[in-house]
Structures are given as structure tokens and as C-alpha cells.
Amino acid sequence: NYYNSIKWMATASDDLYVPDYIDMLRVAFTFKFSRGKFSDLVALLSGRNFETRSYEDSIAESSYAKLSEGLEAFVNQTNYQRFVMIIKSTGLVSKKLISSQNSLNFAYALYLKLREDGMGEAESQGYVKRWMVMSMFIGRYSGSAESHIDEDIKQINEKGIKAYLKQMEQA
């Protein structure tokens, strides 16, 4: 099933963003579940109900389906190529200029989220560019990346990208 979705990558020549399977899982998980800690992914795929602290087959099944949707969005050729174009338009045209793979991962998760939320292409591109540059300048994902990813995606969901990005830029 995934082969048809990823076969275009075999001929892709861009080396700016070359994600491994961990990167793919991180982006898909952050985008679809609005969480950043892999321990939460493992718990959800096991059927963990965080409210009742029990395990339910229905949660495991829906979590697998949701993760699959996230992976499909990740490997979608149009999504991927537009994202790489956005990053290049910031001036980051070489892998050597990017200090943190997790800055790329979060920026891609943010792009997918904003598009799924119905934000227009131009507006979402603007936010993704600003987020990418800000996160690299301050080294946002260099240390405890999982905690920052988790915090950021939750704050974006709570406050909205406009307000949270402004808060981060003013901090």
C-alpha cells in the first residue's frame, strides 16, 4: 500500500531534507496526534486511554489508522515538494545550513497541520518559514527536542499559530 505512495522518492534528487524512518514517524505523529513524545505514540498504539488509564482495542485501532494517515500525508509528493520549496525560500538551500533535523521535522508537521486545518497555502507558508527560522536561531530543538515539540504543538493548538509564534518571537 505504501509502495505506490513512496516510489517517487526513489528518483528524488534533493538532499535538503532526507528524513529517516524516525523522522517520518515524528512528523506523522506530531501532525496527526498533536503530541511530541514517542512514549505517547507507543502507548496509543498499544490502546492506552490516558483518561481512564486502561487499554482499549478501539484506541489501538484508531491510533494505527491515524498514524497511517499521517504517514500518507508525509510521503505525498506534492506536500513534500512544497515543503522543501518553502524551506529553500528562506535561504536554507543546503543541508549544511540546517543545524537541527528536528527543526525541519517540526516545520513539516506544522505545514501539514496548517494545511489540514484549512489555512491557505500562502498564509501557511509564511508561518512555516517564520517558525523554521526562529527555531533554528534559538536552537529550539537542539536539546530536549521531544519536550519542546510536545509543548509547541500543544500551544499551537491552544493559542493558534499566530499568537504562539508571536509569543515565541518576542521571548
Give residue spans per PLM region.
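Flexible coil/loop and intrinsically disordered segments
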Residues: 1-171
